């Protein structure tokens, strides 16, 4: 049994770095996150491209959710994976079930070759939930209940609500909803940051506190939801040249973003 609930653990934190992080994020704000998401993130572009070619918002959003839960252990950059996904389904829209279509796509993928059998099993677990959703229900999740979507995806997969692919699925759903419904809805404060390799390594430069709890506290102090904080940090942590060039063109405070990335 963990003693954490009975004993308050004292984590070691570089307070100077933590203060710079919080102050920098406060200065950037949620609007900076939105600019990065919509004008810098190549994954957002990939989803916009897919939606334009599918002309079917229900299928579009369901495809994005399905693809999100298998977006781990990639054999290429995340941005390249989402563009491969977008181009494939723009040319090969699902004829029957979305899960069947994704199961055909994965084995031939260039950027997501690992653990394919396990990923297909995850899709099969999610299938009954996806099949049950109408476009109106997807709209309701977007405008009113993203936390409910997180809970329902976690339950369908038998995963914790903080699991990386679960919270990442909500982030990508938010992108898809923004594109399909034409309105920006901020992510809830209660949905955690995806604890991937980049975020773990970055967090360890500041504290030995577990990333999820650390970023919850940062979110509370800055007023920026964890998923939007992830958006601010990812360009500099990913290191893709095209992304950095886009950041400098559209974000007036790009130097501050770089400064935060180098803490």
From Swiss-Prot:
SUPFAM superfamilies per the UniProt record, alphabetical: DNA-glycosylase
The entry's keywords: DNA damage, DNA excision, DNA repair, Hydrolase, Lyase
Active site: 164, 196
Molecular functions (GO terms): class I DNA-(apurinic or apyrimidinic site) endonuclease activity; oxidized base lesion DNA N-glycosylase activity
Region annotation (Helix-hairpin-helix) ranges: 139-204
Protein name as it appears in the record: N-glycosylase/DNA lyase
EC numbers for this chain: 3.2.2.-, 4.2.99.18
Annotated InterPro entries: AGOG, AGOG-like, DNA_glycosylase
Pfam family, one: AGOG
Residues that coordinate or bind 8-oxoguanine: 43, 71, 82, 168, 194, 230, 234
Purpose of the protein: DNA repair enzyme that is part of the base excision repair (BER) pathway; protects from oxidative damage by removing the major product of DNA oxidation, 8-oxoguanine (GO), from single- and double-stranded DNA substrates.
Family affiliation: Belongs to the archaeal N-glycosylase/DNA lyase (AGOG) family.
GO biological process per UniProt: base-excision repair
Reaction(s) catalysed by this chain's protein: 2'-deoxyribonucleotide-(2'-deoxyribose 5'-phosphate)-2'-deoxyribonucleotide-DNA = a 3'-end 2'-deoxyribonucleotide-(2,3-dehydro-2,3-deoxyribose 5'-phosphate)-DNA + a 5'-end 5'-phospho-2'-deoxyribonucleoside-DNA + H(+)
Organism name: Thermococcus kodakarensis (strain ATCC BAA-918 / JCM 12380 / KOD1)
Domains as described in the record: Contains two alpha-helical subdomains, with the 8-oxoguanine binding site located in a cleft at their interface. Contains a helix-hairpin-helix (HhH) structural motif and a Gly/Pro-rich sequence followed by a conserved Asp (HhH-GPD motif).
């Amino acid at each position: 049994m963990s003693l954490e609930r009975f004993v308050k653990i004292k984590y070691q934190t570089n307070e100077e770095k933590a203060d710079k992080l919080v102050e920098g994020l406060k200065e950037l704000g949620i609007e900076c996150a939105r600019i990065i998401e919509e004008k810098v993130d190549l994954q957002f572009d990939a989803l916009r491209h897919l939606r334009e070619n599918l002309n079917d918002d229900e299928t579009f959003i369901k495809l994005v959710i399905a693809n999100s839960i298998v977006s781990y252990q990639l054999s290429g950059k995340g941005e390249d994976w989402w563009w491969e996904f977008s181009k494939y389904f723009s040319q090969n829209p699902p004829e029957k079930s979305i899960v069947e279509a994704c199961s055909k796509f994965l084995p031939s993928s260039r950027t997501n070759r690992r653990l394919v059998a396990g990923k297909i099993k995850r899709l099969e677990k999610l299938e009954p939930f996806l099949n049950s959703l109408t476009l109106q229900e997807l709209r309701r999740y977007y405008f009113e209940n993203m936390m409910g979507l997180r809970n329902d995806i976690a339950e369908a997969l038998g995963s914790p609500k903080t699991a990386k692919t679960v919270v990442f699925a909500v982030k990508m759903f938010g992108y898809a909803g923004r594109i399909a419904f034409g309105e920006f809805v901020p992510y809830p404060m209660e949905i955690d940051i995806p604890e991937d390799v980049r975020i773990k390594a970055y967090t360890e430069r500041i504290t030995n506190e577990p990333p999820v709890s650390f970023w919850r506290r940062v979110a509370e102090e800055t007023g920026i939801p964890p998923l939007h904080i992830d958006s601010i940090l990812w360009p500099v942590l990913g290191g893709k040249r095209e992304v950095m060039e886009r950041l400098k063109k559209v974000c007036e405070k790009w130097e501050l973003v770089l400064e935060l990335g180098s803490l």
